Amino acid sequence: GTLTGLTVSADSTINSVTVGKGANSVSGNTVLGEGALDASVTGGNNTAIGKDALTANTTGTDNTAVGPFSMYTNTTGYENSAFGTSSLQLNTTGDGNTAIGRLALQKNTTADNNTAVGQRALKENTTGASNVAVGALALDANTTASYNTALGHQALTGNTTGAQNTAVGYYSLVANTTATRNVAVGSQAASANTTGDDNTAVGSFSLTANTTGAQNTALGKSALQQSTTADNNTAVGFYALGANTTGFMNTAVGGIAADAVTTGSYNTALGYEALTTNTTTNSNTAIGYAALKLNTA
C-alpha cells in the first residue's frame, strides 16, 4: 500500500538510525544517524549526519557535521563545518573551522579559523589557529603553529610548531618542523628544510636540500638546489648556484650562473654561465655572458 500524509512530531528511530532534531528537539537542528546530536541542550541550527556526529554538542550552534564521528566531542564550538569520517572529531570549543576529508583536523580541540581540505589535512592540529591546508596530508603534523598555508599533497606535512610558512606544490617544505616565515612554491621546493627561517624558494627543486640555512632566496628550477646549511644566498635562474652547499652571501642571476660554486662565499655572478666553473674561491665578481666562466682561482 501507499502511506500518505504522515506527520511525526518527535524524533524517530528507524533500524537504530535517528531522524529528527536530536536531543531536546532544539529548533533548527537536523539529525540523521545513530547517536547524532545526542547531548544537545540549547545549541541550535546544527546539522549532524552520520553515526555519533556532533554527539557531545551541548550549546554549540550553526555547526555542520557530515560523516561518522565528525565533530564527535564538540561541546560549545560554533560555526564549524566538518565533512568526512572523524573530521574535527576532537573539537570542543574551537570556532569557525572547516574540515573536508577523512581525519581532516581530527585532533583540533580549541583552535579557531582553520581550513583543512584533504585526507589527514591538519590532522594533528590541536591549538594552532588560522591555518590553511589543501591536499592530502598537508600540514598533517602541525600541532600548535598558526598562520601557515599549505597547498599540495604533503605540503608542510612535517611542520609542528613553525608559523607563518607558505608552501605551494607537491612535497614543498615537507620536512619543515619549527622553522618560520618560509615561502616555497613548486614541486619539492625547500623540501628538506627543517629549521631554516626566512627562506624563499620559487621553482621546482629550488632550495630542495636546504636544512638549516636561513634567509636564502632561490628563484628558478633547481636554483640553490644543493644548498644545505648556507645563509644569505640569492640565486635567480635555472640551476643558479645549483651546486652550492655551504657557501654564503653569494649572488647569482642568470641561467646556471655560479652553478659550480660549492663552498665559496661573497661571489657575484650576473649573466648566463657567469662564474660557472668556480667552486671554492671567494669574493669574485663576474658580469656578462660567460664572464669568468673558466675562473677557478
Q: In which residue ranges do the predicted regions lie?
A:
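N-terminal low-complexity, intrinsically disordered "leader/linker" segments enriched in small/polar
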Residues: 2-9
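Glycine- and small/polar-enriched repetitive beta-structure motifs of secreted/surface proteins
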Residues: 9-297
